Amino acid sequence: MVETDLPFLRRHIDEPTVRAAYLRSYLRRLGGTVRRNYFDQAVTALVETERELRGDSHASLPASVRIGTPAIAANDRTVVPAAAPADTAVAAAPEQPATATDAEADNGRVAIVGGGLAGSLLALSLARQGVGVDVYERRPDPRLGGDAGGRSINLGLSKRGIQALTEVGLIDEVMPLSVTMRGRVIHSPDGGTRFQPYGKNGGEVLHSIDRNELNRLLLDHAQRHPQVRLHFDHRLAHVDKDRRELELESNGERVRVRPSWVVGADGAFSRARQEMQRGERADFQQEYLEWGYKELSLSALPDGGSQIELEALHVWPRLHGLFVSHPNRDGSHTLTLFLPFEGPDSFATTTGEAEVKALFDKYFPDLVPLLPNLVDDWMSHPTGSLTTIRTGRWHRDDWIVLVGDACHAVYPFYGQGMNSAFEDCSALMAALARHGQNRAAAFAAYEQSRRPHTDTLAELSKANFVELKQKVKSPWFVARKRLDVALNRFLPKTWLPLYTMIAHTTIPYGDALARAHRQERFLAGSAVGLAGAIGVGAWLWLA
């Protein structure tokens, strides 16, 4: 009870709208998160006030005072707008649905749906700019144990991701968690190997990093920031776009929050995207690869050394299967096998011990002695699927925007999924900085700057699947790649291989592909250049 309100209440206690307005003002003074028991306490306080003023121990509030009671369920939580002055509250009209302006009064906090790599990085980026952030993640806290939900746990960090991590001051902590990969080691069916460097010098490398370890680091730093609150086991159930309200499920309860604005960073099967696009004119395309994947482990030697070359991405290319290996800091390797879902020698036909051994004896005989737990790992590890997602629009007005896989999931074969998601965060922050308070313009500019290029990345990722599966073992392909490296060495500012532009620069994906096409046309259009290319390529191949 606020003493300064007593004189006014004594004069106007018989007016139900005054009592209702007072109750609303009381609730606003509570601030923050209001549960049902707090609401009940407020009602009780107001009843006691009436009794005190009337000297009536049996006074009770009429139904008109209980405005809003049915709207706050026993297990709900809602963010209530900040308090208005007492005289303003008294003059307020009868209760109306909350508006966007009311929601923004909650200290301007942003809700990020999804606490994975992109969500946790963006939370930290916003917090460093003084923005309050609430991260809602449907899974339990990954720092307390568990796995990555069946997804590949090793990722290739390259220039775009490095740039984003540098912007938030974390790159010096991330790099020690990674293993440098200087190129590919191609394993032939006969057991032979061939090394293909990633670039023309030792600086053009990739970095293998454990997804879970990186996610834990980002969450730790986000949680340490006073502007960030992390909420695990919170699944987005519904988005009320008109009221600008999120409804989440947590431990069997429904929670309603009303942030200033929302970021959907909840992955390829994004609930935020589904809710944002519900009832809207939106484009959406989802494409599954007819191949799936299964993860296996190649353990380190007893002394901690690696059974195969550590500082490389290992590839076993086969027409009917593809093995890729990422190194780990402890000397082990995470192997990912890609196979067709159906047909001969597929996941559908490789279900028992005999079939597993026969598959490896046929396609990957050099791996068999290195994998003593092959059958057990095969039986215990799930089979995952791969999807490409393209959609539009990526935002709605100035209130909700998507980043990462939620708006552009790609196949993993170019190693750019995480890097492009991190680049989204950088691009969104830059757009917000350029457009100031005009968030709708910032969201539109962000999408315009990114969507054409992530669409290009989707096509590049598909094409690289064919490259890894078939082309990397071709002498002509290898000679062409070496020619690219040689031309880049002699003409570093003029000739850039496509892979160099994608992995080792921040040139937008679409611009990189367009430049690569121009270079190809120039080379093909010059008889002298073509003859020289063949000669140089042959020399490099034989060298």
Positions of PLM-derived features:
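Active-site-adjacent segment of FAD-dependent monooxygenases/related oxidoreductases
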Residues: 146-221
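Conserved Rossmann-like nucleotide-cofactor binding loop
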Residues: 118, 141, 269
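Conserved mid-domain beta->alpha element of the FAD-binding
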Residues: 115-128, 264, 296, 382-463, ...
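Glycine-rich FAD pyrophosphate-binding loop
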Residues: 127-149
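Charged, low-complexity interaction regions
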Residues: 13, 17, 28-39
